[in-house]
């Protein structure tokens, strides 16, 4: 066969890179009917052949055609137009596939949706696509009420119906029919909606060499239907006449069970993401044995896993694949051989069907072999562009008009990927041109990591690199090479701790200290040399340590395993190291579980690996045969492990009634959080009260003197040092919330337990960029220790400051429109998963407090909204999120659209007065109070109202803009002092699909205030809740010198 017409850039030389046209399985094909015609043809030629098999039942090709045609008629009766987007939302099973076929038959466009998406995401995708009609199964029938819903019904059809429908060919739509809308998982902003035409799927399905799938094959369908991999699983399978076997995605959490399920279902075709491949292979090395073809892609190929599969249970074909969504699934592939894995190389050597590629330099000229350039992909697989993104489409989907070096008559997609072609035509992918890399499933901007490192002021030079060892089974590590500003005093932990405050956990790198940076011939930092020398040094150190130890001991074998799954750990692992302290992630922990089970035949939990055991403890656990160990935890939701932590405290309430703290012989207050914003105002108010004899403040400090200095510094900061405040009643003691005796020592701990009349606990660690584990000690263990203190000495009441964040983004996630003060907190356990580590820690802490209330501990809970400035003076916290947001938006002269989002502002003086009043009342015992505006006063769009008032206050026009565009504008500010800069991780880190944590709070519910309203109804100054208005905002901005 002459391949010259199918090889771009390789016309004049012999090349390993080849493109393959298909050898038709069933003679000449007529494409005028498009995808629907392919199903129709299968149904006519082999009507009884199984098209879908699920849960013991089968739908044949004839039945699939009939069901699709009948459902398509329903759509037609609704007056649908050509290529109109139709939403599809179903669970695993027949319905999704029947619905997609029906939409194609009707000449429309499938907009398939993952049911696990929050409603706002579903609504955005449907609205952006212009959808008005949605096909749903029974389980999702009530979730899309704003759209016209058609239920997918799969009741039995008669043979006569099948015969009748087989006589009628489907509507002819041709190859240009836009059949699908896919969504990218971009690292910033909302997902881009990519248009897919019938020709793209036909062009892939007809490549017999690279798609060796026949009538007898069975393809597992388990990808999210909004991603392009699902198109292969569904449509390429149908176009090849094979059988689709739907498999539940819930099995992804148990790879061993998943592997067994594939075998039980006789799956012969699999598409396995590169990040999942090693997990499956190491769980069951023979999992692919007997399969026809396995495709793996999405990240760099995992050659050790491929090697194991090829050695112990190879499929007939194992492909490494590359292709962006914009080019419909795959564009370049390579059939992996054992020789490839042993040589540790895996290039791309084949083009899919009529795919064409060009490699251009930044000026748009072709690069010579051996040089790197940007990859451009052309051919029938290329999308027409994005939906409602004309500028982005024009930028990425190009022709010879924009790039004269590109061949004419063909549209190309500019991938943004850096590749190199060898003299023999092999293609190697080197990553993103913009230096964005993928590390353990996260997209990481290396320049962004470097900027965060430089912002700490601890280093003079840095280079962040993706490091991957040849024997690493998990993927890459993020390593930062640094030259310290003060080499004699610098430690890597200093930099790590500083970064944990600024960036998301996955952006905190392993730190490697250098005395100088190597430079390449272009006088730039030689990153390749840095990585090479780092790996060489790590290997040398490990070999040296291995030579001094008995390799047969459990701890030596275990240390070797730890090293193999921690590619960023170049130093010797000590006996006392924990997996978490070494930077181990949940994915690496899961791999360690598999490795240890295979090596030692013991069962461990991820919590033990990731957070609990040192290397020596784990070795001892193995030597003891694996004692039974269970913990209530979800694998990758750290806060859930503590849901029942209260039981472990084994506390008993003290007998007798607690005193009125303001009684004539009382007035002795123990409080935490005096250096915080609320605590400072609470302390000042307490010290003005004649009934208060003394206030002991627990403060994190080296000694009592420094503790008092911290407290007084905060009082001065907020202008609270007034003549009416008696600071002689203040006693500051150095302590630590996360210590069982609060850092006081046993004797003083017990003395204060008898001394205190009550406890005000407002101390907490608050950092919106840090994960749960960073907040656990202070917020969870700290609250546990306060409960211990309450149970020590004599009875006393505890007044606990919680937060509205314990509800999480429940409006968006759970669909609740109203939540009550007395609602079970467990209702919101799933929603808080999508909030930050602070919110998760406060949820766990309040759950613990509620459990204590059930045990008759005398406690009251206060959940304020966003704590704002003092209502009279305007004194506020200039470093909290709202203050930073206001200041930054004023500088940008733009603010983001945040639909149905409110902060439920509460002035700090109102909050303090309400807490103190309720603390004196018996009716508040055991109660929880949502300290927010009452039901009829809670604004629906308080954020937008606030921005409007801000515009008036600064007397400068401010424009509203979509959140993603506002975020991009914010990031363009070349100013390290911008107040929102430290919080950028929270603003852009995607929690679920493309929703950041702040966006998750759209569609906020109404917060019930029945308890608050009832108990403050007749209290002067408190019965009427103050709301944010223009005068109050002006006072606040004036105090901060913003106006």
UniProtKB/Swiss-Prot annotation:
Coiled-coil annotated spans: none
NCBIfam families attached to this UniProt entry: Thioester-redct (TIGR01746)
The EC number(s) this enzyme carries: 1.2.1.-
Name of the gene: cpsA
Catalytic reaction list: L-valine + ATP + NADPH + H(+) = L-valinal + AMP + diphosphate + NADP(+); L-tryptophan + ATP + NADPH + H(+) = L-tryptophanal + AMP + diphosphate + NADP(+)
Keyword Phosphoprotein on entry: yes
Cofactor(s) it depends on: pantetheine 4'-phosphate
Protein name stated in the entry: Non-canonical nonribosomal peptide synthetase cpsA
Modified residues (O-(pantetheine 4'-phosphoryl)serine): 586
One Gene Ontology molecular-function label: oxidoreductase activity
Record-annotated Carrier domain positions: 549-626
Pathway: Alkaloid biosynthesis
Region (Adenylation (A) domain): 41-386
Family as reported in the entry's similarity comment: Belongs to the NRP synthetase family.
Thioester reductase (TE) domain sequence ranges: 672-915
Taxonomic path: Eukaryota, Fungi, Dikarya, Ascomycota, Pezizomycotina
